[in-house]
UniProtKB/Swiss-Prot annotation:
Gene source species: Trichomonas vaginalis
Subunit structure: Heterodimer of an alpha and a beta subunit.
Family: Belongs to the succinate/malate CoA ligase alpha subunit family.
Location in or out of the cell: Hydrogenosome lumen
Pathway in which this enzyme or protein is active: Carbohydrate metabolism; tricarboxylic acid cycle; succinate from succinyl-CoA (ligase route): step 1/1
Name of the protein in its database record: Succinate--CoA ligase [ADP-forming] subunit alpha-1, mitochondrial
Gene that specifies this protein: ALPHA-SCS1
Length: 309
């Protein structure tokens, strides 16, 4: 359906990562060290880290390089995971993109919105894909590859693609699909900030084009129009005639004008409500799970109805 959308990026994995993804860590403090170890234990190829003052040393079993250009030259890294604190995170994203990274995953929260506008401009100019900021990352059980802080024990290789603004609801959906025997193809936490890199539509398009992904769970939050935009694309392409989609939106009871956890989770001017998102998604043929505990049950029922299990 969508091969043309990605024809210019044939050298990049359709679902962002694969078994050959080589990862560099930017921000090798306590959290960077801890999660780099977990990533390697899972099977991810973490090839080094960047710290301008500690180049030439070994930290947490990783060789340390002075800058991103050096690490790319020495290791052929093609993806970066950023744990740099908020004041320097935008500069780290830009450095990674300009060094030729195909993918940047930014875990950092509280990056100024003005900084993120600059980051998104550079990402567009370089063709680098940004996931985040303020996200848990992504995981691909079939290749044992993950970038981020996602716990691995609840995932199993399978058929369902999950895209989510909420970290914890990502894990809820993953565990439910594992228990249902469906498993996951790739799971992407896009983050809850107003200026996120990948939005729901960007990821859903990739799931639609991926033959292993046979069903999709979309998890949104109040605020913004990412979910409505995805609903418009799903309706336009009649995606639900080919692959079932189940959606759940967090924040249905949030009072207008009050931020709920994530910087982007705020209803203002009568826009971004949970009901508005549900209405748009339902009109596109998406099955709605108003309680997140039903996500696994509903996607199982939809997969069975369409003869996919």
């Amino acid at each position: 359906m969508l091969a043309g959308d990605f024809s210019r990026n044939l050298h990049k994995p359709l679902l962002f990562i694969d078994k050959d993804t080589k990862v560099v860590i930017q921000g090798i403090g306590n959290q960077g060290q801890f999660h780099s170890r977990l990533m390697r234990q899972y099977g991810t190829k973490v090839v080094g880290a960047v710290h301008p003052k500690k180049a030439g040393t070994i930290i947490a079993g990783l060789p340390i390089f002075k800058n991103m250009k050096e690490v790319v030259k020495r290791t052929d890294a093609n993806a970066s995971l950023i744990f740099v604190p908020a004041p320097g995170a935008a500069a780290a994203c830009i450095e990674a993109a300009e060094a030729g990274m195909g993918l940047v995953v930014c875990i950092t929260e509280h990056i100024p919105q003005h900084d993120m506008i600059k980051v998104k401009k550079v990402m567009k100019e370089t063709g680098c894909q940004l996931i985040g900021p303020n996200c848990p990352g992504l995981i691909q059980p079939g290749t044992h590859t993950k970038l981020g802080i996602i716990p691995t024990n609840i995932f199993n290789n399978g058929k369902i693609g999950i895209v989510s603004r909420s970290g914890t609801l990502t894990y809820e959906a993953a565990y439910a699909t594992t228990l249902a025997g469906l498993g996951q193809s790739t799971v992407v936490g896009i983050g809850g900030d107003p200026f996120a890199g990948q939005l729901h539509t960007d990821v859903v398009k990739r799931f639609a084009a991926d033959p292993q992904t046979e069903g999709i769970i979309l998890i949104g939050e109040i605020g913004g129009t990412s979910e409505e935009d995805a609903a418009e694309w799903i309706a336009k392409t009649k995606l639900t005639q080919e692959k079932p989609v189940v959606a759940s939106i967090a924040g249905a009871t949030a009072p207008p004008g009050k931020r709920m956890g994530h910087a982007g989770a705020i209803v203002s001017g009568g826009k971004g409500t949970a009901e508005g998102k549900y209405k748009a998604l339902e009109a596109a043929g998406v099955r709605i799970a108003r309680h997140p505990g039903n996500m696994g049950k509903f996607i199982f029922e939809e997969m069975k109805r369409m003869g996919k299990i």
